[in-house]
């Protein structure tokens, strides 16, 4: 078997269908009868299987490899033969020594002609053999190349034919009706092409013509269909190419540098990292934090999240402007000695303000409501040629924050303790504030003129809190004074001046001023008013002051007596007008050079405070979500607080919030400094709140709204009364308690049977009163065996409503007949008990 025949045998087999083939298919008609349908196939289709395609490709590769190997072998063989022939020629051309060496001159001359002729013939034969070998090798190489080319073309035709037949591969999978319709369409199109283009005669009956065979016609139809299919594909390709998008999705997310400020929302962080916000929320859930898309994150948390997701973080300080404004100071100014700032602290009613009155020679205590101080008073006095600034703080428990502020702003604390009262809770608290601020203490034992005064007891009690007198080896000066009579006051001032000399207090006098807000309030005529204690520099009229969230130019300054002044040096308290709003007590007040920058810093602080507050509220909402759901209904008392000064507002709001219990919560809907306005009244009406005015009054428009809406408005000037009335209002909102009170006891002496009531107990009332309509208990051996009510109560034959102690009666117990002699019947009533906080 030749190689060509072997390749033909290995070629993939193809299935050919006849042009005309009939078959019968049984089908069911609509009536349910069987019907035979003849199916005729008129197309020649060649179906190549996938195995055949693979075999063709394998054959092509194998043939190409064999042809290349054969050509290489033939070329090597030809080279080898050529080399052998060359060696033979060289050997023949080289004469042997015997031949080359003539025996003698006569032998050389008489050479044999036959020998020369034979040599020439051998050389000619060798040349012809070389030529034949070369031609044979070239012919074999050419044949091998042609075979390889032929095999490659055959394989290519096989693949192309397989692609052409794809359109017809599902021919036998369609129904006979569809195939007949397709064949009819093909015949019609074929006849149209034949008559229109080629101008040939009509086909004979049976679909044949004289010029073409069956195979040619089928090939024509196939070519026409292929051309139509290619046209469609090219159109679709063009249309698809116009709609193709130019975007390609990156294979990997780029990790960029993320700039994070002091606060950033989850959405902003996701935007900077070019990821979805849900990824950040998932990451934080893994870290144990529940957040929402709008939640504000602090810088540290945002940094952790960004680094967790593989980004490099660049931290940015957003308060750079604030720092630059505050650092722009006079650094080379000379420091001079300044006056001490003294805060007078102690328990309520121990005589702090009265002591300060005597020092100032002014009757301030009489002007305070109820004789107690409601806010910080700041005064400076001159004694022995030296100035001392006094801060008078409230002693009531509600004013803790005020006392803390006073201790922070001060140099020396004068602790006033009543000699007849001793150490009290606010005395202890004042000691703690002074210790926390690191401020030395001078103890003034007041009310020494009272007969029941016992200053030694005060000294002993203060030892428990590490306040050791100098006579006990400590460093605390004790001065006995009487604020009423003025005894010992000069000694107290000397002690203060001595303590200030020890502290060596200095401050810059001529530089830009800075200080602290002691108190602030809203004056209806003058606007926001802040009491500022200057701590360094000199505050002048016209200076630009940055004060917490507020800023402004100083329009006017007044001292504690209400006199206008133009400047105030270190340790001098002044009232300042001209701020944009009411600053919070305790804020730092700083003079800056540029009003525009001051406004920017104030706005930045407001925005930052708002973000932090929002973040805190959001966190509280998420953390307390389930606890709030489980609490159920809790009564709420809504309150709106308006007061004359900021410190009083803080104290009242804090005290009200501390009144909250598990059953009733006080919710401060609104608070502020200044008079009660129409806006406050409208808010109270909308939130159903109580309005509380502390040393303020409502204006005319607010009073109209209050009358129309029937709002509960209350005025106070003493914080005791305010808190007591709020407690009473909260007590009214508590759920009442019910208590059972025993009102009578009867002992069973005999049992009678009654046809209507059953067992009737003949009883003697031993205690209290037995009433007809009250609930009862039956006791046997002091154990309750039944609880119910009376069905009848008789005395002799008369029905009565009650029987008193020491009288006999007949008692019928409803739904209970097992009463025995010796049992006790206990009569009680349910009493509602009002609760209070």
UniProtKB/Swiss-Prot annotation:
Biased composition (Basic and acidic residues): 62-102, 111-165, 206-229
Keywords for this protein: Cytoplasm, GTP-binding, Initiation factor, Nucleotide-binding, Protein biosynthesis
Residues passing through the membrane, by range: none
Region (Disordered): 1-44, 62-251
Annotated segments matching region G2: 371-375
Location of region: G4: 446-449
Positions of region (G1): 346-353
Cell compartments where the protein resides: Cytoplasm
Region called G5, residue ranges: 482-484
One annotated GO molecular function: GTPase activity
Pfam families noted in UniProt: EF-G_D2 (PF22042), GTP_EFTU (PF00009), GTP_EFTU_D2 (PF03144), IF-2 (PF11987), IF2_assoc (PF08364), IF2_N (PF04760)
InterPro entries in the cross-refs: EF-G-like_DII, EFTu-like_2, IF2_assoc_dom_bac, IF2_II, IF2_N, P-loop_NTPase, Small_GTP-bd, T_Tr_GTP-bd_dom
Domain tr-type G: from-to ranges: 337-506
Biased composition regions of type Polar residues, renumbered to the chain: 242-251
Extent of Basic residues compositional bias: 189-205
SUPFAM superfamilies on file: Initiation factor IF2/eIF5b, domain 3, P-loop containing nucleoside triphosphate hydrolases, Translation proteins
Region of interest (G3), residue spans: 392-395
Family of the protein in this entry: Belongs to the TRAFAC class translation factor GTPase superfamily. Classic translation factor GTPase family. IF-2 subfamily.
HAMAP family the record matches: IF_2_B
Function: One of the essential components for the initiation of protein synthesis. Protects formylmethionyl-tRNA from spontaneous hydrolysis and promotes its binding to the 30S ribosomal subunits. Also involved in the hydrolysis of GTP during the formation of the 70S ribosomal complex.
PANTHER family named among the record's database cross-references: TR-TYPE G DOMAIN-CONTAINING PROTEIN, TRANSLATION INITIATION FACTOR IF-2-RELATED
Name of the protein described by the UniProt record: Translation initiation factor IF-2
Source organism (scientific name): Actinobacillus succinogenes (strain ATCC 55618 / DSM 22257 / CCUG 43843 / 130Z)
